[in-house]
Swiss-Prot record:
Family: Belongs to the MurCDEF family.
One GO CC term on file: cytoplasm
Key words of the record: ATP-binding, Cell cycle, Cell division, Cell shape, Cell wall biogenesis/degradation, Cytoplasm, Ligase, Nucleotide-binding, Peptidoglycan synthesis
Species of provenance: Crocosphaera subtropica (strain ATCC 51142 / BH68) (Cyanothece sp. (strain ATCC 51142))
Gene: murD
Subcellular location(s) per record: Cytoplasm
Catalytic activity: UDP-N-acetyl-alpha-D-muramoyl-L-alanine + D-glutamate + ATP = UDP-N-acetyl-alpha-D-muramoyl-L-alanyl-D-glutamate + ADP + phosphate + H(+)
Protein's name in the database: UDP-N-acetylmuramoylalanine--D-glutamate ligase
Phylogenetic placement of the source organism: Bacteria, Bacillati, Cyanobacteriota, Cyanophyceae, Oscillatoriophycideae
């Protein structure tokens, strides 16, 4: 019996393990975590014939090498163990690539980008599903991709997929050497994850590899970096713009754009823009890319319009929570870098009280700070980044900030200040990762939502 190592006991790792076990492999999951909370899960998987090694760092013994190693998205591709595995020519892939091996008989839509990919994925899935297609979303949202593969291996009634809609991070691109979508979308590109990918050029090449393998490529022409590369790359691609037909980087027959408050796709009027309820130009960009994918998939414009009219957005992405004393509380916890946080501020009314901070990331904060100076009457700083953010704001001659450290204190203080200063919006848009205080950006956003709902 062939042996597979799974690195990481998260949702995707467990799904990959169950998938391989169903397909007749001997499966060993390795995870460096030692929490007692994992013991019941370890026992449950053992009962299914899957070995789980906790507090374990894998190594490659020449006498007992696996035939396959599957890596969870959070595991760096350049760890010594994985480098050695590839040097020994052991088949080493990510969980998404494993799913592709089982699901490639269905066409895929693959969505990648620094920001915007989650909302775009949700839009694509809503349109395809609204058109009565069996088109589940997976990757960073929806299912783990191998959960879909497992359903197919078990021949479940729901596993006859018309399309697979996959949100694909740079980590997943990096560990997926063969994944080849029918339709590939690239939403935005700015500096992010450089602590992992080292250089901007390397980060770009990792993203681009997915598009090169896609049969059809769709790009956001309003993204400055992608626009610039589009002048000399991607000659046959489909392009979008919110700035009208004259700003397309392709012939209008291959473009999707906004003209006179209508969405036009490949030369045909699709829907009036006022059907789409999400705020911000960035969400209009996401909309155009989703419509481009839908039209390439042959979906009728009536089905597209119906899906868009009922689409309410995605949790943690400019998610409206409630209004208290005329002040809107907005959850933008997914804004884990400066560019996303800048977009968050661009999308809400002013004056705004901003809650920011967390685990600091590298990046250019100038445009974000410019938006703070333009729209924000008070910044409440939380998490590890609070001191550095305070210093940076002070150095940029912005002094309306307070260090409050925790979300609980931020919510309590924000309502008091909002009433005093007549704010229109209290916005959580952290410009940081969440791992200093939370398990994930979702965990952070859920805590924000819970605290907001408790306000009297």
């Amino acid at each position: 019996m062939a042996t597979a190592y799974i690195i990481g006991l998260g949702r995707s790792g467990i799904a990959a393990a169950k998938c391989l076990k169903q397909d007749g492999w001997e499966v060993i999951i390795s995870d460096c975590a030692t929490s007692p909370n994992l013991i019941p899960l370890q026992q449950q998987l053992h009962a299914e014939g899957i070995t789980v090694k906790l507090g374990h760092t894998p190594n490659l013994n020449a006498s007992d090498l696996p035939e396959l190693i599957v890596v969870s998205p959070g595991v760096p591709w350049d760890t010594p163990f994985l480098i050695e595995a590839r040097e020994r020519q052991i088949d080493t892939i990510g969980e998404l690539e494993l799913a592709w091996r089982y699901l490639q008989s269905s066409p895929w839509v693959g969505i990648t980008g620094t920001n915007g990919k989650t909302t775009t994925t949700a839009l694509v899935a809503a349109i395809f599903q609204g058109a009565k297609l069996n088109a589940p979303s997976c990757g960073n949202i929806g299912y783990a991709a191998c959960e879909l593969a497992l359903s197919k291996l078990k021949k479940d009634n729901t596993s006859n997929y018309d399309w697979i809609i996959a949100e694909i991070s740079s980590y997943q691109c990096e560990s997926s050497q063969e994944l080849s979508p029918k339709i590939g979308l690239w939403t935005t590109f700015t500096a992010d994850h450089l602590s992992r990918h080292k250089t901007l050029d390397n980060y770009y090449a990792i993203k681009a590899s997915l598009l090169y393998r896609s049969e059809y490529q769709i790009f956001n022409g309003d993204d400055p970096y992608l626009h610039q590369t589009g002048l000399h790359q991607w000659a046959d691609a489909y392009w979008t713009t919110v700035k009208g037909k004259d700003n397309l980087l392709c012939d209008p027959s291959q473009g999707v754009y906004i003209q006179d408050n209508w969405v036009v796709a490949f030369g045909e009027l699709i829907l009036p823009l006022n059907l789409f309820k999400m705020p911000g130009f960035h969400n209009q960009q996401n909309l155009l890319m989703a419509i481009a994918a839908a039209r390439l998939a042959g979906i009728e414009k009536g089905a597209i319009a119906s899906a868009i009219a009922t689409f309410t957005g995605v949790p943690h992405r400019l998610e409206y929570i409630r209004t208290v004393d005329g002040i809107d509380f907005i959850n933008d916890s997914k804004a884990t870098n400066y560019d996303a946080a800048e977009v968050g501020l661009l999308s809400v009314q002013s004056p705004t009280i901003l809650i920011a901070g967390g685990e600091e990331k590298e990046g250019d904060d100038k445009k974000w700070i410019a938006q703070i100076k333009s729209k924000v009457i008070k910044v409440l700083l939380i998490g590890e980044a609070a001191e550095n953010f305070a210093k940076r704001l002070h150095d940029c001659d912005y002094h309306d900030y307070e260090i409050v450290e925790t979300m609980d204190k931020a919510i309590e203080r924000s309502l008091i200040l909002g009433q005093e200063l007549k704010a229109k919006v209290i916005l959580l848009s952290p410009a940081c990762a969440s791992f200093d205080q939370y398990q994930s950006f979702e965990h952070r956003g859920e805590h924000f939502r819970e605290l907001c709902q408790k306000l009297i």
